[in-house]
Amino acid sequence: MLARKVKVFTVSPVDVDGAKKVSDVEDLRTAKLDLTVTLGGDGTTLRTFRYLENEVPNLAINVGGNRGILSEITLPQIDTAIGQIISDNIFLDRRIRVVASCNDEDFPPALNEIFINRQNLTKTSLFEIRFQNDTATQKMDGVIVATPSGSTGHSYSLGGPIFHESLDVLIITPVAPVNKLPSIVVPDEKVEIISNHDSNIIMDAQVIKTARFDDVITIRKYKKQAVFVRLKKQGLRQMSKLGF
């Protein structure tokens, strides 16, 4: 890539001869980038998308031995991937993201899910879920609002369904409801959640914000998508990563 006079940035601790090194991915938030490459697991990929403002395509390389649900390749495949990128023999996989807001403050976007749970573990909270003109009220430990990308994550571990990544829907999954309440699949429109106790608002298991009791937490589709570089089309990509 450097031989082709491509300008390359690396984020510490990665170091490549001829590349400009920055200390944190946030230093590239507004940079005009054509491509990003992440080395690590899904957490690294989620963090990268959260910090970059523009819809920059990302090639996710799984390093570390975990499943890498979001990744496209492993390190031994990197030369093949670069060749396909240079020859434009790739396709872009666009995924919806979600963002939460409370009291006129927008929180960082999430690719997988937003998890709202009770702060006080000694009391069961009453959660009110509003969508369009309907309301569901239930005592439970929390609520997950997941995207199709996140349908193989926390929501799935609680019995939620797996969805194809290209769908524009949200999955609302209750966490330990007192009375059994199934996951609810809704169009990607505004969802409002209110709890009668103070709550945590957790984005992709990485960023935690808080809300007071009776605050309205609004979750909606984020204005910008996450864009993945794919070397080949795969109809059930996420399910195959889970071993199905």
Predicted regions and their residues:
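Generic structural signal for beta-strand residues in well-ordered domains
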Residues: 1, 29-30, 51
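Catalytic phosphate-donor-binding core of small-molecule kinases
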Residues: 2-27, 64-143, 152-244
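A general structural motif
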Residues: 3-5, 33, 55
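Short, well-ordered secondary-structure micro-motifs within conserved domains or adaptor modules
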Residues: 26-47
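Short glycine-rich anion-binding loops that position phosphate/pyrophosphate groups of nucleotides
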Residues: 41-44, 64, 149-152
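Short Gly/Thr/Asp-enriched flexible loops that form oxyanion-binding sites at enzyme active sites
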Residues: 46-54, 155-159
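Proline-centered loop/turn at the N-terminus of a beta-strand
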Residues: 57-59
